[in-house]
Amino acid sequence: AAEHIPGGYTIEDTISMCRILEGNVDLINVSNGSFGSREAAKLTIGSSIFMPRGHNIEEARQIKQAINIPVSVVGGLGEPELLEEIIASGSADMVSVARGLIAEPFLPEKMASGHPEDVRPCIRCNYCFSHNYIPLTPYPKRLPRCAVNPVFGREDQFRQAQCSTH
């Protein structure tokens, strides 16, 4: 929605661009940041635990109110209560969840079955990023892993447990 760098595009610029795109795109996915500086990159490269959850929700709400295109929002949204609130409040039409699904691959099923308390939460440590493609980060290249889901990145080494029936 905004680059957060001097001279970068703003939320107003984004709304103007979205209005131009009306009738030509199916969905606007709202995020913030830029790779133009380390500070702005913190908003782009998966918000860490030091960022508030859902830090893009307000911009998504502003964009949704201004245009007639479905809006999705991303950014530290792995908690079931937050996902429900975004949709219920009309802040966005859809939520984009990545790290939350790495931590808990069955997040949609657990929410749909009425068991959000069983969701293994993403702790937003960003250990899942491989850092092979992210500029401005000093991390060594390695295979992606998850601090709370030990199977992630090793699915071929683990077989799905079979439930016995009585």
Task: Please describe what each predicted stretch is.
Residues 1-166:
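Flavin-dependent oxidoreductase catalytic cores
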